[in-house]
Amino acid sequence: MEMASAFTLNVRLDNIAIITIDVPGEKMNTLKAEFASQVRAIIKQLRENKELRGVVFVSAKPDNFIAGADINMIGNCKTAQEAEVLARQGQQLMAEIHALPIPVIAAIHGACLGGGLELALACHGRVCTDDPKTVLGLPEVQLGLLPGSGGTQRLPRLIGVSTALEMILTGKQLRAKQAVKLGLVDDVVPHSILLEAAVELAKQDRPSSRPLPVRERILAGPLGRALLFKMVGKKTEHKTQGNYPATERILEVVETGLAQGTSSGYDAEARAFGELAMTPQSQALRNIFFASTEVKKDPGSDAPPAPLNSVGILGGGLMGGGIAYVTACKAGLPVRIKDINPRGINHALKYSWDQLEGKVRRRHLKASERDKQLALISGTTDYCGFAHRDLIIEAVFENLELKQQMVAEVEQNCATHTIFASNTSSLPIGDIAAHAARPEQVIGLHFFSPVEKMPLVEIIPHASTSAQTIATTVKLAKKQGKTPIVVRDKAGFYVNRILAPYINEAIRMLTEGERIEHIDAALVKFGFPVGPIQLLDEVGIDTGTKIIPVLEAAYGERFSAPANVVSSILNDDRKGRKNGRGFYLYGQKGRKSKKQVDPAIYPLIGAQGQGRLSAPQVAERCVMLMLNEAVRCLDEQVIRSVRDGDIGAVFGIGFPPFLGGPFRYIDSLGAGEVVAIMQRLATQYGSRFTPCDRLVEMSERGESFWKTTATDLQ
């Protein structure tokens, strides 16, 4: 039986050809290699029909034009040459579309990304809808690749080299208004008239290319170009720390096309695409992509989730305000905040106002839409309006008795089906549910700060939590735009447990005489977004160290922090950025200056700041402890799979994505190498570096955590 075509041709009475894109059986249109023959057959028909006046590409999907190329195609390539051939095939197809003698227009609604935007760029004109779902971008760099079907050559010529570089190097996505302003699209229209607007454009002569702004014309010249690429190269190197080869190749390929012409540019693009596809960085980033896609599809349990119509939040502080924002503005659910103090409610409302007003100022949101979303949030100082809430998220102080009291109050004031979800970061969920009348409806829902930015949540069922409670909480987290992992109710859960030894070791090196900026720079060079000491300042030194005694009580001295260091810092009223006193100096608000260490820290903790370790030695000590603890978490079934362990570390603490997560990284080094490093460190620095039994066993057997396919071991 012949497979239904993803591309179908219909010719209207006015001799405009409509090519409809609709990949059978898929929610998203993605480009596959086998579609090339379908498109070529259509191009042949178009060339043979001399009556045609124009062509329009349009999607039949309700919320996407083309979301990109199918990434599995790259995984199927065994060599750089095979991946290069794939890119050349894409380039050739786009060239054939562009070579049609009549106007070809892309009618864009929804996501137009990667290969989808490259197809749109090959058209002679583009019209898109003003819908918030419509975004245009080239996100290949986030997979360790570059656009391989002509994007690196067409985009700079259309919108200018500096703007194109920003899009390609960051994977930045543009909304409709930004796209038309930059000249990426020719018109923005309501969805209802998209096709007709594209048809009208197709009836005209080919849209003439918009003259580039003077600045872009100067930067395209030899002198301006040399200056631009030097400046962008320096900035990119600082940002990536040399850990992402794709950025360097993007700069090289774009410059080749501008300096030597498009033919050389396309050649360089295809070659670079093939070589990048084989890099360990790209393979790791693609694995993270596949794993996060799997996690988003995981229901958390076998039971069907209960309906979610409205949510309540206890506590209007920083976390409560952030949770209210993602619940109302991302999940679209009515939220009622209870706080004993009206100021707490006002704080939470202002939190959402500030987030939404920022979007209005950046023209990402209409004022009317802001008001509509804010109307979903209300507040109260008692339980008025809580009677029929389906799920209550508790975000009060980390105090067990207080949280137990919250459970009792919710059970008295809410419906019998209401789920109680605690945002605790350190208290056992089983203890919070200890006196509950309905313990099966108590669960942990651990968000990370800042809530609106951090993609991960940990969902923590205790021994009596029902399967439906798990499924419903997972469903809510996904609605909030989060990536949820289900973890076991053990001290520190997963993320904080693997983070604590990493932070502790950084503090220990500080007491040994290593400089703060050296420790942080070493871990940033390794691939973390910020160093461990700066991270403590950002989350709050008091908040970040609160978990340490809990973990030490549960797991012993391997979690003990260097004696008296943390207490000395806290006793000096140093809480980090939030009170302007931490390891670093904080100037006036809004000033963007290079971070400087507060020199008063060293005498305070009795350290000299005269370190002897190299950056790789510093990183090794912090990271090895994190890897060892991650393996222990898998062994104790704190995490359900290595997939969840990798996603939790990358999305929860910024473990370097190009390494693929702790378990992928151990596999890339080899368990034997990790054990050898840890045994050496144990000899040098103490028993906390002793590799766990699972690692030693895997080393002896030559085993790895992941199979060679994209499925995990469990």
UniProtKB/Swiss-Prot annotation:
Pathway as given in its UniProt record: Lipid metabolism; fatty acid beta-oxidation
EC number(s) from the headed UniProt entry: 4.2.1.17, 5.1.2.3, 1.1.1.35
Annotated keywords: Cytoplasm, Fatty acid metabolism, Isomerase, Lipid degradation, Lipid metabolism, Lyase, Multifunctional enzyme, NAD, Oxidoreductase
Region of interest: 3-hydroxyacyl-CoA dehydrogenase: 306-714
Highest taxon in the source lineage: Bacteria
Coiled-coil ranges (or none): none
Family: In the N-terminal section; belongs to the enoyl-CoA hydratase/isomerase family.
Function statement: Catalyzes the formation of a hydroxyacyl-CoA by addition of water on enoyl-CoA. Also exhibits 3-hydroxyacyl-CoA epimerase and 3-hydroxyacyl-CoA dehydrogenase activities.
Protein name according to UniProt: Fatty acid oxidation complex subunit alpha
Organism, as annotated: Escherichia coli O81 (strain ED1a)
